[in-house]
UniProtKB/Swiss-Prot annotation:
EC number: 6.3.2.1
Domain of life: Bacteria
Pathways per UniProt: Cofactor biosynthesis; (R)-pantothenate biosynthesis; (R)-pantothenate from (R)-pantoate and beta-alanine: step 1/1
One Pfam short name: Pantoate_ligase
Binding site for beta-alanine: 61
Protein name: Pantothenate synthetase
Annotated Gene Ontology cellular component terms: cytosol
């Protein structure tokens, strides 16, 4: 497995693979890999001849008081895990490689980004869309793989790729969870044992709402309130948002008559966690 630190290196690797007629699968990450990331890589491996991942903690998607500086980083560990699932190359650029002096171009997707994480993290999706556009242009994959845990991000990237006529397919992979239901996240490492226990309220509240939906409840406000009440009962939880929108349009709903996204963001201590569930059949 090759580790490339420069754009020219990873482009040369991809060019060589293409010259042999190999398809390219791409998984962009910020590193500190977990089983959710590895599942994306396995899906890429199943579908594509060559798998490239990026490991880049992107500064433009973090706000001024967020966790950019303390976001966990361990390239040696990540390379070992990626190698075990058959990744062919890692692109691990520096900030200077991606954003050289004088950089001033950004990508902004409208409408889909003005709610949920986009509302509580201003500028976040501008940073995400910019770095993903750059990575797509550098790697030029046939397929790119994103996790459903970041449901809004996956929808935004799909919209961006379609709107800008990017020549690739964006594939969303179901959320991978711990045995007790907690959605896999690199930020879970921040949680102490008591916070880790408290964090289960996210997945359990989604499951409770899912049960009510399957039992026939279609009133979006009642389902939302059910989740809010359950999370508020957890002393360590501080709610950022709990919302229900049509899926994939992300339009407000009163009654759920088709697929709907129940999405939430909750702070456990200082750690912001997100999770979601799709209500209704896709």
């Amino acid at each position: 497995m090759l580790v490339c630190n420069t754009i020219s290196e990873i482009r040369a690797f991809v060019r060589e693979a293409r010259s042999k007629g190999r398809s390219i699968g791409f998984v962009p990450t910020m590193g500190y890999l977990h089983e959710g990331h590895l599942e994306l890589m396995r899906r890429a491996k199943e579908r594509c001849d060559t798998v490239v991942i990026s490991i880049f903690v992107n500064p433009t998607q973090f706000g001024p008081n967020e966790d950019y500086d303390r976001y966990p980083r361990d390239l040696e560990r990540d390379a070992r895990l990626a190698g075990q699932v058959g990744v062919d190359a890692i692109f691990n650029p520096s900030v200077e490689e991606m954003y050289p002096a004088g950089y001033c171009t950004y990508v902004d997707v409208e409408r889909l980004t003005g709610k949920l994480c986009g509302l509580s993290r201003p500028g976040h999706f501008r940073g995400v869309c910019t770095v993903v556009t750059k990575l797509f242009n550098i790697v030029k994959p046939d397929y790119a793989f994103f996790g459903q845990k970041d449901a809004q991000q996956a929808l935004v990237i799909k919209r961006m790729a379609a709107d800008l006529n990017m020549d690739l397919e964006v594939i969303t992979v179901p959320t991978v969870r711990e045995a007790d239901g907690l959605a896999m996240s690199s930020r879970n490492v921040y949680l102490d044992p008591e916070q880790r226990r408290a964090a289960l309220v996210l997945s359990r509240s989604l499951e409770k709402a899912g049960e009510a939906f399957r039992a026939g409840e279609r009133d979006a406000s009642k389902l939302r309130q059910m989740v809010l009440d359950m999370i508020k009962a957890e002393p360590l939880a501080n709610i950022d948002y709990v919302e229900i929108y049509s899926y994939p349009e992300l339009e407000p709903l009163d009654q759920i008559n088709g697929p709907a996204l129940l999405a939430l963001a909750v702070k456990i201590g200082q750690t912001r966690l997100i999770d979601n569930a799709i209500l209704g059949q896709l």
